[in-house]
Amino acid sequence: MTRKYFGTDGVRGTVGEFPITPDFVLKLGWAAGKVLGARGGSKILIGKDTRISGYMFESALEAGISAAGVDVRLLGPLPTPGIAYLTRTLSAQAGIVISASHNPYTDNGIKFFGADGRKLNDEIELEIERLLDEQMSVVSTDQIGKVRRIDDARGRYIEFCKSTAPGLDLNGMKIVVDTANGAAYHIAPDVFEELGATVVPLANQPDGFNINRDCGSTHPEALQRKVVEEKADLGVALDGDADRLLMVDHAGNLVDGDQLLFVVARDRKENGAEMDGVVGTLMSNFGLELALQAEGIEFVRAKVGDRYVMEQLDKRGWNIGGESSGHLVCLDCTTTGDGTVSALQVLAALSRRKQGLAESVADVSMLPQKMINVRGPNRDGFMENGDVQAAMADVEDRLAGNGRILLRPSGTEPLVRVMIEGKDVDRVESLCRELAEVVEKAIN
């Protein structure tokens, strides 16, 4: 069955434009309540990030779910992985996240976790979609779901984060923490501080509009400057819903998801944890693959998206995977990507090696990689375009086996990502621009 509303990461779009409207979200809550309630669900959790529209959609979901006869527990602003954690520890049937992740405040989205703290399976999402086309009804008055807030959600999640790095002592470390004015603004700084670090908070004053604006993992420049200015040991950058992590070393150099994945995987292997292999994506730098190979760790590429990384991890029985963008998954700690937990795993690895971040990533050399996001409405079938095919063949000939090309439509935005990787940075950038120009003509 073709999906009508759910994309690769729930329902997402511009606030006020269908389907990100209060009336649709009301009905989505009702449909979810009907489907999950019929499966024996007693309650559904709702959490959100800090964008202004979150309050509106929280109310809509709350009304829809309770109209279907299912109880609701409101978590307030909380990182996406925190909602996943509480869904399973509070024995909820599902957790709903109101967030558009790293997108600006003008966007929002709705995604679901199942009772196990993992993304809701396709079968249930399709059941919910089917009900969205039916007439909404309300249960009898005595069966309407009850709603209450979970006042200690923040504290529960902070304690969980700390528990994933037992014995970690950050005394003597100075860490700049950029929470992107997002869901971790009142959580991540406290986690590191409670473990002994001196914390310099950055972008931790959300006003409903400034989420991800010139801050966080998508705009780490301010963090890079602040780390140098404060003479900090390192910096941590999260995104708006705190499931992504990038870091900055003491000199202000950005450390991406591929490099962090290497640090965590090597640490697991060196310290006797089960480490058969690592799952990356089609976008993962070839340098990561080479570095893991040198450590005797197998590397497999999944399609882009944490959903597909998780599928490969489950299929192979592995624990560690991630994306260049900073989605790191440590299934030996939690059930989904978690920026704060991932940062603690990196810090624990540095502590065990008695190294700084720059020294620890020196063993993974990233090949020059250029990516251009090409916007356009006509993404379907662009790979069959003759001009695009000819341009790709030409670029592959000129790379002469010393690089790779990837063209990939975004799952959440109207754009195509054009990526080229190779040994010579100037050549890579030139070829990427050439190919992007051809793609732009094809999709516009």
From Swiss-Prot:
Q: How is it modified after translation?
A: Activated by phosphorylation.
Catalytic activity, reaction form:
alpha-D-glucosamine 1-phosphate = D-glucosamine 6-phosphate
- Main EC class the enzyme belongs to: isomerase
Q: Where are the Phosphoserine residues found in this chain?
A: 101
Q: Which domain of life is it from?
A: Bacteria
Is DNA damage among this UniProt entry's keywords? no
Needed co-factor(s): Mg(2+)
Enumerate the residues binding Mg(2+): 101, 239, 241, 243
Q: Name one Pfam family in it.
A: PGM_PMM_III
Q: Which InterPro entries match?
A: A-D-PHexomutase_a/b/a-I, A-D-PHexomutase_a/b/a-I/II/III, A-D-PHexomutase_a/b/a-II, A-D-PHexomutase_a/b/a-III, A-D-PHexomutase_C, A-D-PHexomutase_C_sf, A-D-PHexomutase_CS, Alpha-D-phosphohexomutase_SF
EC numbers: 5.4.2.10
**Keywords of this protein's UniProt record, alphabetized?**
Isomerase, Magnesium, Metal-binding, Phosphoprotein
GO CC list: cytosol
Q: Name one GO molecular function term.
A: phosphomannomutase activity
Q: Which biological process terms from the Gene Ontology are attached to this UniProt entry?
A: carbohydrate metabolic process; peptidoglycan biosynthetic process; UDP-N-acetylglucosamine biosynthetic process
- UniProt entry tagged with the keyword Magnesium: yes
Comment on bound cofactor: Binds 1 Mg(2+) ion per subunit.
What are the positions of the active site? 101
Q: Matching PANTHER family, A to Z?
A: PHOSPHOGLUCOMUTASE (ALPHA-D-GLUCOSE-1,6-BISPHOSPHATE-DEPENDENT) (PTHR42946:SF1), PHOSPHOHEXOSE MUTASE (PTHR42946)
Query: What does the function comment of this entry state?
Result: Catalyzes the conversion of glucosamine-6-phosphate to glucosamine-1-phosphate.
Similarity section: Belongs to the phosphohexose mutase family.
What NCBIfam families would the database entry show?
glmM (TIGR01455), PRK10887.1 (NF008139)
Name this polypeptide is given: Phosphoglucosamine mutase
Native source species: Alcanivorax borkumensis (strain ATCC 700651 / DSM 11573 / NCIMB 13689 / SK2)
**What are the leading ranks of the lineage?**
Bacteria, Pseudomonadati, Pseudomonadota, Gammaproteobacteria, Oceanospirillales
